[in-house]
């Protein structure tokens, strides 16, 4: 499936923001979906990590938010890891502000799941808003957020080890695939040829 890159991410978030408010009680779903997609992308989360976040795993700090990942695919023993997501200058696309807004309207018991959805729902929500944004929803999956982060970070010249620190990859093999994708046009030999 295709990674979600910055321009597509912005289109998807705008589609969420523009969604009609006519259905009473659905406003919090809109806040959830925006926070889910922005946090998923910004943190390079796996779907399973994203849906397992509990309220007690979140700590808002002056710089942004710290999210504890208690267990993941590459951490079956449950050592845990903390992902730090800073505030973005662009408030419309800031994952920290989106998460705060959602929590303000949805706070529950500390032991409960923040997003309260299945990992399959992540893909369904993403596909739905991709279509609303005029994109081909069939080209995206829940993993598109994670691969989108890694590919975008590589496009912006972020070092391999820093991408791995955020995504939790233990080996460079997968991260290098994202970097290769990001560099298809950037380092293309045809850029040097003038016709």
Kindly give the residue locations of the regions a language model identified.
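Extended, non-catalytic subsegments within catalytic or DNA/protein-binding/adaptor domains
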Residues: 1-195
């Amino acid at each position: 499936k295709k990674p979600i890159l910055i321009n597509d991410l912005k289109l998807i978030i705008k589609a969420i923001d523009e969604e009609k408010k006519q259905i009473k009680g659905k406003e919090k779903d809109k806040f959830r979906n925006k926070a889910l997609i922005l946090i998923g992308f910004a943190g390079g989360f796996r779907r399973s990590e994203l849906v397992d976040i509990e309220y007690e795993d979140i700590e808002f700090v002056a710089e942004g938010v710290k999210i504890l990942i208690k267990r993941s695919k590459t951490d079956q023993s449950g050592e845990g890891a903390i992902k730090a997501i800073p505030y973005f200058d662009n408030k419309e696309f800031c994952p920290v502000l989106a998460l705060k807004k959602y929590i303000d309207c949805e706070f529950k018991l500390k032991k409960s799941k923040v997003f309260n959805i299945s990992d399959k729902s992540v893909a369904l929500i993403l596909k739905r808003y991709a279509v609303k944004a005029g994109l081909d929803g069939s080209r995206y999956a829940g993993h598109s957020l994670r691969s989108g982060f890694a590919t975008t970070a590589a496009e912006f010249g972020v070092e391999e080890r820093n991408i791995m620190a955020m995504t939790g990859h233990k080996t460079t093999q997968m991260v290098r695939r994202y970097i290769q994708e990001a560099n298809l046009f950037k380092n293309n030999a045809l850029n040097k040829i003038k016709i």
